[in-house]
Amino acid sequence: VHNNVVYLAGQLAKENGFVKNVGRVTEQISVIEAERQMKICAQHAFSWLEIAAKDNNCYIESILDLKVYVSCDKEFDGISKIADKASEFFINKLGDNGRHPRSVLALTRLPQNAPVMIDLRASLKLK
């Protein structure tokens, strides 16, 4: 946290400490599974935001921006649909304050061979 902004990097969809299903979307991972994992990434990120807010006697004011990474082959064109799951999660949690600008990037490989990952910045406000 710096100047009431939380910087979260590299949120993977870990379950019981590790990424359960690995590989590229449409090769080893279905779009449905990628969407499920994207929601888990968002849930983990939101949990970290809640901890940061509590530790700083604040509440989560808004999501400032979101970066979504999808590991897939070069022909796959559905990365925005997968990213929508994270965006929807934050909007459901924070209402209009969950709306955010977003970048969505397709890559050939992510850490731990995860299919999806997110980074974000969020603002906190003193209670």
Language-model segments: which ranges?
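Short, polar/acidic, helix-capping and beta-turn segments at strand->helix junctions
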Residues: 1-127
